[in-house]
A protein has these predicted regions:
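A conserved mid-protein helix/loop that constitutes part of the nucleotide-sugar donor-binding site
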Residues: 13-21, 197, 201-223, 237-243, ...
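Short alpha-helical donor nucleotide-sugar binding micro-motif in glycosyltransferases
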Residues: 79, 260-261, 268-273
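Short His-centered aromatic/hydrophobic patch
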Residues: 89-95, 114
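A short, well-ordered alpha-helix in the C-terminal region of glycosyltransferases
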Residues: 185-188, 341-354, 363-366
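Aromatic "clamp/platform" in nucleotide-sugar-dependent glycosyltransferases that forms part
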Residues: 281
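Short hydrophobic beta-strand element within catalytic cores of glycosyltransferases
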Residues: 298-301, 311
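Conserved acidic donor-binding segment of nucleotide-sugar-dependent glycosyltransferases
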Residues: 313-314, 318-325, 334-339
């Protein structure tokens, strides 16, 4: 079985690497990768080292329309050259030209994973018609959460018969190896020794991640817990705005902007936390939920993405209303007064069962095989 993946705007994609490593061990499928990126992507060397073909198509998302028009014939040419059994696209910028190119190239199994569901609906509604076109051009549409599946059917008007729910997944061993000595270094780096509760979030600084509500919640929480510390781990265009909001709220002593935390340090970072707090609005999935839960961190979250699918309120985590600092603060207070350790352990068991990479692998490979069987 030969699967050709397209991907845009990233020069290295962890879950594609995990798929490639697994395929190399098992001898199937054979992968080809077409990467749309401004400069030569790291994925070229990573995937070729694993024995798979990679082609680079120069693409700059700052010139989106022109870039996709430039990429379309090149995608088509590579698909005609490689003749894969399956074309699988992942993000809007590669899915729109990728699905069109695959259809023109006569590829009968065209799979799209909707990793960025809802973005255009919230921020650029006029692009929604192209999201719908992608779903029409695809033969199979992977929804990565229940909320994503409902959105695809109800708002993108995707054919329910095409939609298959396959959760994203991570290999636990790569994300749960906490190092006590590194944890001590991180405590010193963030100046949180002897403080608590330690409440953290991992997300880009963009509006729909809900940082403004986290800061509003922090202002309420510190009144009852003056030694509370909030670790905000991320980068993004809204960071300066959030920094100003922290200062205006008198929270400079309580909120720490962690800056870059290396991927290899993330398990130890989660080990610092008493609570993982997430305030996203329409999160397609959110791998950080799975990471935090697999590390046994009690989660307080808005009801979206992987959190909504996994958490039973009060059993293995706490769910609160979106766009509400008060609800987030009350959720944290509920967690602090509950058996947080037990809730974290229950969340870990749930995440290992639902969001293990093996589940994602098996669901995806099964989809390919069933789709190809129907073509025979």
């Amino acid at each position: 079985m030969h699967v050709l993946h397209t991907f845009a705007n990233n020069d290295s994609v962890p879950y594609l690497t995990w798929f490639a490593e697994r395929a190399r061990r098992e001898g199937d499928p054979r992968y080809t990768f077409l990467v749309m990126y401004p400069k030569r992507p790291r994925m070229i060397d990573e995937m070729r080292a694993l024995g798979f073909s990679v082609e680079w198509i120069p693409y700059d998302d700052r010139q989106r329309k022109r870039g996709m028009l430039f990429a379309l014939p090149r995608l088509w040419w590579y698909m005609r050259r490689y003749r894969p059994d399956v074309v699988h696209s992942n993000l809007f910028d590669d899915s729109l030209p990728g699905m069109i190119a695959a259809w023109l190239a006569g590829i009968n199994v065209r799979v799209v994973t909707k990793q960025d569901t809802g973005f255009h609906w919230m921020h650029a509604p006029r692009w929604m018609r192209l999201d719908r076109l992608i779903s029409r051009m695809a033969t199979h549409v992977i929804a990565i959460s229940d909320e994503c599946e409902r959105f695809l059917i109800e708002r993108e008007c995707a054919d329910p018969k095409k939609v298959v729910r396959i959760h994203n997944g991570i290999p636990p061993a790569a994300f749960t190896q906490q190092d006590p000595s590194l944890m001590e270094q991180l405590r010193a780096r963030f100046a949180i020794a002897g403080k608590g509760p330690i409440i953290g979030t991992v997300a880009r600084f963009i509006e729909w991640k809900g940082y403004r509500y986290i800061i509003g919640a922090a202002a309420r929480i510190v009144k009852q817990h003056p030694d509370a510390r909030f670790l905000l781990c991320g980068t993004g265009g809204q960071e300066n705005e959030i920094r100003n909001l922290v200062s205006q709220s008198g929270l400079d002593a309580h909120v720490i902007f962690t800056g870059w935390v290396d991927r290899k340090e993330m398990a130890s970072f989660y080990g610092l936390l008493d609570i993982y707090l997430h305030a996203a609005i329409l999160e397609p999935f959110g791998l950080v939920y799975a990471e935090a839960m697999m590390n046994g961190v009690p989660v307080v979250s808005t009801p979206t993405g992987a959190a909504l699918d996994a958490i039973v309120d009060g059993k293995n985590g706490i769910l609160v209303n979106e766009r509400s600092a008060e609800a987030l603060a009350l959720g944290v207070e509920r967690m602090l007064s509950a058996d947080a350790r037990g809730m974290g352990a229950a969340g870990k068991e749930t995440a290992l069962r639902m969001y293990h990479f093996n589940v994602m692998w098996e669901g995806t490979i099964d989809l390919y095989r069933r789709a190809l069987d129907k073509q025979r």
